[in-house]
A protein has these predicted regions:
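N-terminal beta1-alpha1 cap of cysteine-dependent amidohydrolase-like domains
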Residues: 1-81, 195-242
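Beta-strand-turn-beta hairpins that frame and shape the catalytic cleft
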Residues: 1-3, 140-143, 179-185
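Glycine-rich beta-alpha junction loops
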Residues: 9-11, 150-152, 191-193
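Structural motif
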Residues: 54-58, 90, 186-188
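Glycine-rich nucleotide phosphate-binding loop and flanking beta-alpha elements
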Residues: 62-63, 96-98, 152-154, 193-195
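Cysteine-nucleophile active-site neighborhood
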Residues: 62-136
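Pocket-forming structural segment of enzyme catalytic cores
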Residues: 107-177
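A glycine-centered loop/beta-turn motif at secondary-structure junctions
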Residues: 171-209
């Protein structure tokens, strides 16, 4: 298949190596015999989401996030239409907050979000920087990574991580984290999240094939990624039980 990835604001929203989520997805899809084009969408640039197979945005500073919101919100109707059509999307880090109804910054200023989801985000001056060990209903493997966040997100009815044994979730310590509905996935976890979690990468690939109406063939497993996940999961689980 010929597949297109839309990478929104890669220069602005790419903290913590977020771009690697696109790199590993592209490589995996190509190893499966697909031709993959990555289209970089810069601030103010137009994007045709109707022909996208994967939409991605990474993490940025709080200031960068507001700049991204200013331009991304102009594409709100197109993003919602693509989500309704089943286009696979991943929003990593604080780009997740753009999907909600509002973002309130640490000075109390309120910004309108896309309204793709019903949650709200309130940012604080205090940051939470810590490792994460959690669980999703999508598969059995633990979800690992780390967060560097300053927000409390309320109103998420369908989180990506159902529970956490370590780390701050949407509303506080060890609670549900992220957002997932249909083919839209979002999480504050970095690492990058798809590199740290091969099982979640597999979910993305399967969602892309499902949207295309194609049967997903066997997905190649990167042994270094698999070993990295196993070691990280073992170490974090041990810390959880202390």
């Amino acid at each position: 298949m010929e597949l297109k990835i839309l990478h929104f604001y890669p220069d602005l929203m790419s903290l913590y190596g977020s771009y690697a989520n696109v790199s590993i997805l592209k490589r995996t899809l190509e190893e499966m015999g697909n031709t993959v084009t990555v289209e970089r969408v810069e601030l103010g640039g137009d994007a045709d989401l109707t022909h996208a197979d994967f939409v991605y945005m990474g993490a940025g500073t709080e200031r960068a996030q507001k700049a991204a919101l200013l331009y991304f919100s102009k594409l709100g109707d197109a993003v919602k239409a693509a989500a309704d059509a089943g286009v696979t999307m991943l929003f990593a880090g604080n780009s997740m907050e753009l999907l909600g109804k509002t973002i309130t910054d640490d000075a109390g200023k309120v910004y309108e979000g896309l309204g793709l989801a019903d949650f709200t985000a309130v940012q604080n001056k205090k940051r939470f920087v810590e490792d994460v060990y959690g669980h999703t209903d999508l598969y059995e493997d633990a979800v690992v990574g780390f967060v560097n966040r300053c927000s409390v997100i309320t109103g998420v009815e369908t989180p990506l991580l159902a529970s956490m044994d370590m780390g701050h979730g949407n509303e506080g310590p060890c609670g549900p984290e992220g957002y997932h509905k249909g083919s839209v996935f979002a999480s504050q976890l970095t690492g990058p999240i798809l590199v740290k979690n091969p099982a979640l990468l597999k979910v993305m690939v399967q969602a892309i094939y499902r949207h295309r109406g194609e049967t997903c063939p066997e997905i190649p497993v990167d042994q270094y990624m698999a070993q990295g996940w196993a070691i990280t999961a073992e170490q974090l689980k041990a810390r959880c039980t202390k």
